[in-house]
Amino acid sequence: MFRDHKGMMELMEEGRPERPLSFWKIIFEVMREALPFVLVTSSIQIISLIDQETFQRFVPIFTTYSFEEGKELITLFGFNANKIIMIVISLAMSISTAALPLLAAHYSVNDREEVKRVIANNLGLFAYIMIPASVGMAIVSEPIYNVFYSPDPTGTYLLIVSCIMCVFLGLFVTFTYILQSMEQHIIAIKALGFTVIIKLLWQPMMMYFLGGAGPLIASSVAFFVATLYMCRHVLRLTRFDLNYVLKKFGQVILASFAMAVTSAITLFAIKQIMPIGGKVRALIAVALVGLVGVATYGLITLKNRLADEMLGARIGGIRRKLRMK
């Protein structure tokens, strides 16, 4: 920075605004842009707080569980499973934030065609990575739970449901970032408000019918409805190619289904050979099943060239090495 100090000063002189901005005006602008980001990115924590504050109060009213059983359930899905799925959720956040500068730059100069392209590609990339990651984690939920905690069928079941919720949560996060990169902060905050309201309304009913999995399903419904609201607004604002996005989601879901089948068969075979209750054996099972799953998904998406569309033309080199057309 010291070496380039002169050049930076010249750039600052050239970029000086025609009218001076006061210190408080700058602070206000920073707060106006930053606060919505902080609020919306806290959605995961807000939903977790709702579960922590309401679940045990609702347990004796809407379920047949005792107070102690309620405490155990909230530990299983609110803490144990939540820590594991954060690995997958971080993928959604990294995908969403990667396109922010590019999308904001094109939107600021009113380049509508590039805005539509970036949004469609970002959603396609989200599906390409997030859906198989969530499906894969659901398949290996038993051994991966055993790696971190003591074997528990209920904990494994709640982890599977949490993995399903990850997809809806990831979509919610992706659309909030898309909206905020286009300065649609109010819409993103409204979507968060809808999420909280729907979560509170659905929580008792889902707990009554589904017990411990109820809060997770309520969260999934809330995130899904809020995502539809945001998607409608983004579609109206940019007219991005929704058919293209849905087509990519369909291709990813089919490839993920094939991956799930091969992974489940592999896990079944491993369980016939050795028990996976111990942490080391569970870790070996996760690694082997993960390897089979990644290979299956990778080969399918290379074959139908979905990988090329999502990850770039350089992926074609892998296909040539594998002698795939």
Predicted segments — roles?
Residues 164-194, 209:
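Membrane-interface junctions at transmembrane-helix termini in multi-pass inner-membrane proteins
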Residues 1-9, 15, 26, 118-138, ...:
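Short alpha-helical transmembrane segments in multi-pass integral membrane proteins
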Residues 73-163, 167:
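Specific pore-lining/lateral-gate transmembrane helices of multi-pass inner-membrane transport
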Residues 1, 196-228, 239-243, 267-287, ...:
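Membrane-interface helix-loop junctions in multi-pass transport and translocation proteins
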Residues 175-183, 231-248, 275-276:
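Alpha-helical transmembrane segments
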Residues 187-212, 222-233, 257-267, 292-301:
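Alpha-helical transmembrane segments of multi-pass membrane transporters
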Residues 265-325:
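Membrane-proximal transmembrane or re-entrant/amphipathic helices at the cytosolic face
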Residues 1, 17-98, 259:
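Transmembrane helical elements of multi-pass membrane transporters/channels
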